[in-house]
Structures are given as structure tokens and as C-alpha cells.
Amino acid sequence: MRLLPRLLLLFLLAFPAAVLLRGGPGGSLALAQDPTEDEEIVEDSIIEDEDDEAEVEEDEPTDLAEDKEEEDVSSEPEASPSADTTILFVKGEDFPANNIVKFLVGFTNKGTEDFIVESLDASFRYPQDYQFYIQNFTALPLNTVVPPQRQATFEYSFIPAEPMGGRPFGLVINLNYKDLNGNVFQDAVFNQTVTVIEREDGLDGETIFMYMFLAGLGLLVVVGLHQLLESRKRKRPIQKVEMGTSSQNDVDMSWIPQETLNQINKASPRRQPRKRAQKRSVGSDE
């Protein structure tokens, strides 16, 4: 009987605890925690909104900077409609590295006011982005006044750097001038992609070997022709010319021994028939 109240007390203590752990109908603690979670969610959303506003504020300066850059680009001086320009490369549109490139720029004033041509400049740009400079050449100061309906010609020359040989670059040639009112103009006389040619200095090994090979081949041809002509001369037979024996002087006596010739010369010649007949006639008269 004493254990029964104790067991009942333990049951009363354990049952509510089990119900609370399982989330039963007496779950007031879980309901009490919901407001805190809602507060955390609200705080997170507020923080996210603040981050979005900060990102928007950060993006606005970049947009303003881009707008300023576009305004700067658009504010660059342009060519005047009252002027016309032409360009002529003296040696053609070939750009050898480490060699002088010369061209002439013609300026025509088609307006009614004077133009003051200030300078002429040239530069190599990156082919994919002409805003990126590779090599900037020295500007040529001109300060020349061109009256209305008149023309002027200007000469400019530059030397491409030797390491640029064999690569394409954007060549930009600008003519800067202004009118009497102070309005500044800039005309892109030439704005195209060109290729710098590698300069060939002297003779390379392949060229020298080719010349030596051709010289040796020519010498062999000459020697072969000479040997061919000599062999034909040797094979050609000697034509024997038959000489008559009409006179004694035409006979070749060199093959006869000298002793035999001496004996022939000592022998008395034969008498001719006429001399014998004359002697007989003289004897008959006697």
C-alpha cells in the first residue's frame, strides 16, 4: 500500500514529460518558440533588403562612370563638313619593320572661313580594340593657315619598331585643325588594320646554298659538253686524199732513206730522144 502512492506520483510526473517531448496537445513551448523564429525570419529579410539596396547603390556609380566614358568618347572632335582630306603613301601600303614609312596628306578647305591646321599624328593600335595604344608616334606640329577654296599638302614619316614585324596592327592617322572661332576638329585620315612586314637583311643560308648549287650545276654542264665534243672529234675518221704522180715534185720522198736518195741523185739522167736524134744528124753530116 505504501508503494502505490509513490508509483502514482511517478506516473503523474512522467506522463506530462512524455507528452511534452512528443509534441502533444500540451505543446505550449513549441508555440512559444514560433514568435522568435518569425522574428529571425523578419530580421533576415530586412538584412537581405539592405544588401540589395547596397548593391544598387554600388551599381549606380559604375553606371555613372560608364555614362561619363560614353560622353567623353562622344565628345571627341570630329571632322568638319567644310573640309576634305586625302592620303597617299609614297611607297605603297607596305610597312616594313625598322624602315621609314612616308605618306602625304592633302587638306582642302571647301568652306568660306580659314582653317588652321595644327598637327598631324599617327599611332599603332590593338586590332581588336582601337582604344589600346601599341606604339604612339611623335605628333608633327604644322600651324598652317589654309584659306577658303585652297589646298595644302603635308608630309609625315615614321618607323615601325622591329619587333612588330609579321603582325597586324591598327594604324590611325589623325589631322587636327580648327577654325577662326576656336572650334576644334579632328579627321581620321587613315583608320585601318595593316600588317608590318619583316625586313630581310642580307642573304640567308638557304639562298647561299641555292646559288652554290646552281653554280656547280652549270659547271658540270659545261664540262660535260666539252667532253662530248672532244669524243666526237676523236671518233671522226681522217679522209685520205689521193695525190697524183704527174710530177716528181708532188711525190713525198720523206719515207725513203737518205742514202738511197743520195744514190739516186748521183746516177746520170737518161737522155731525151730529141737530143739523140740531133746527135745522129750531126754524125751523118760529118
From Swiss-Prot:
Residue ranges that the UniProt entry lists as topological domain Cytoplasmic: 229-286
Chief site of localization: endoplasmic reticulum
Signal peptide range in chain numbering: 1-21
Compositional bias (Polar residues): 244-266
Basic residues bias spans: 268-279
Pfam families: TRAP_alpha
Cellular compartments per GO CC: endoplasmic reticulum; endoplasmic reticulum membrane
Subcellular location: Endoplasmic reticulum membrane
Region of interest (Disordered), residue spans: 46-83, 236-286
Entry-linked PANTHER family: TRANSLOCON-ASSOCIATED PROTEIN SUBUNIT ALPHA, TRANSLOCON-ASSOCIATED PROTEIN, ALPHA SUBUNIT
Assembly and oligomerization: Heterotetramer of TRAP-alpha, TRAP-beta, TRAP-delta and TRAP-gamma. Interacts with palmitoylated calnexin (CALX), the interaction is required for efficient folding of glycosylated proteins.
Name the record gives this protein: Translocon-associated protein subunit alpha
Recorded name of the encoding gene: Ssr1
